[in-house]
């Protein structure tokens, strides 16, 4: 029912399925070890993965969910949920601050780049450290073209990409890649592979960009065009504390959802991935984070693809949030990375036996309307 505040509505969910807790949980005294987490986009798949990872912590944290979508939030796994304004509204932060005060929140986990940006820009309003990378880091990483130029200037491997100032620029950009055959066209901002596809000639690129301009309102100048990387796809997620990498895990993406529905054969959503040991990939990612910020704190996720001759190059970085589709794998490794993050954010640094990730092979299998499943390599043929 309405709380009396104009921007927020409180929903007390019953403990059912994966949920837990009662109203009495909110009256318990707060100790130094308690984690009281607010998870945004509650009810989404990304938030569900985060909440399941948080529930694996002992003692289990108190978990509050928030979402502006009153339908999606009905699927939330949190103990208590709030309907809040959209993150892009001026009332969003007021609502979050109200929840922080009401429920003694000491940890906020944003599950998308919009929330990471809003929290980053208003961090001084919060009564505790939001455990985010610097504002400048988040801004740089949310502009893929600016990040690409930043790394090129510092000798960190990235694909060659160029801004599309106008459709007339396309001929000149293609001329720079004469003989390469396939280029990668994408929007410089946004998530979920927005505006991204492979193109083989100027006409394809022009038609693709014009379609997004006319139907989705994305400006031509928001597109980039450059080197297509056909090799293996990696992500490296790491948690940092004052310039020290507490834990980093390398994951290889093996296959994707709905690859038959787009010409590139890839997407931003893996349905099969695995933990790997890739020293060169890890080194590049750690060097990249240190180049951006010499005293980083929080979570940073780096994506890479290999060139035709097998050299990894950074395609983008998501700073201040966990990747939506591999969180379950990060939590299922011998050291739960979400626990490392939550404890560091609330003042406790864990002892981690394998700070550069597990050497054991774990596979993450995901599909629509199915809970994600993690399987060790040794168990792949069990029961078959």
Where are these regions (language model features)?
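ATP-dependent carboxylate/phosphate-activation module, predominantly the ATP-grasp catalytic core
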Residues: 203, 207, 226-233, 237-294, ...
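Conserved hydrophobic "DFG−1" position in protein kinase catalytic cores
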Residues: 198, 227, 238, 304-306
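ATP-binding N-terminal substructure of ATP-dependent carboxylate-amine bond-forming enzymes
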Residues: 1-133, 168-171
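Active-site nucleotide/adenylate-binding loops and adjacent lid/helix of ATP-dependent enzymes
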Residues: 2, 138-223, 230, 242-243, ...
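Short glycine-enriched loops at secondary-structure junctions
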Residues: 67-70, 113-115, 136, 244-245, ...
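ATP-dependent carboxylate activation and anion-phosphoryl transfer catalytic cores
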Residues: 7-10, 15-21, 26-28, 35, ...
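Short, charged, surface-exposed secondary-structure boundary motifs
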Residues: 74-76, 92-94, 139-145, 193, ...
């Amino acid at each position: 029912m309405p709380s009396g505040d104009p921007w927020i509505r409180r929903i007390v969910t019953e403990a059912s399925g994966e949920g837990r807790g009662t109203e009495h949980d909110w009256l318990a005294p707060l100790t130094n070890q308690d984690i009281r987490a607010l998870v945004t986009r509650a009810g989404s798949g990304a938030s569900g993965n985060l909440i399941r990872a948080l529930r694996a912590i002992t003692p289990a944290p108190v978990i509050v969910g928030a979402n502006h979508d009153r339908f999606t939030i009905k699927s939330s796994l949190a103990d208590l949920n709030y309907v809040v304004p959209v993150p892009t509204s001026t009332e969003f932060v007021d609502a979050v601050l109200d929840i922080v005060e009401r429920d003694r929140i000491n940890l906020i986990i944003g599950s998308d780049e919009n929330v990471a940006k809003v929290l980053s820009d208003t961090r001084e309003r919060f009564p505790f450290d939001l455990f985010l990378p610097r504002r400048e880091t988040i801004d740089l990483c949310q502009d893929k073209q600016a990040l690409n130029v930043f790394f090129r200037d510092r000798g960190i491997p990235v694909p060659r990409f160029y801004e599309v100032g106008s459709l007339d620029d396309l001929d000149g950009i293609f001329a720079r890649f004469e003989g390469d055959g396939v280029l990668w066209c994408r929007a410089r901002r946004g998530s979920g592979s927005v505006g991204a596809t492979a193109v083989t000639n100027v006409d394809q690129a022009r038609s693709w960009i014009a379609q997004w301009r006319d139907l989705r309102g994305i400006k031509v100048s928001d597109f980039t065009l450059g080197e297509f990387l056909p090799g293996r796809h990696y992500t490296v997620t790491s948690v940092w504390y004052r310039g020290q990498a507490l834990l980093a895990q390398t994951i290889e993406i093996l296959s994707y959802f709905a690859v038959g529905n787009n010409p590139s054969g890839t997407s931003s959503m893996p349905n099969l991935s695995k933990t790997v040991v890739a020293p060169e990939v890890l080194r590049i990612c750690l060097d990249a984070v240190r180049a951006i910020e010499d005293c980083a704190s929080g979570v940073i996720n780096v994506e890479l693809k290999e060139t035709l001759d097998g050299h990894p190059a950074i395609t983008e970085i998501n700073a201040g949030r966990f990747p939506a589709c591999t969180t379950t794998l990060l939590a299922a490794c011998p050291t739960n990375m979400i626990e490392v993050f939550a404890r560091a954010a609330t003042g406790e640094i864990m002892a981690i036996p394998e700070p550069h990730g597990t050497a054991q092979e774990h596979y993450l299998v995901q599909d629509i309307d199915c809970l994600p499943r993690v399987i060790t390599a040794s168990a792949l043929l069990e029961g078959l």
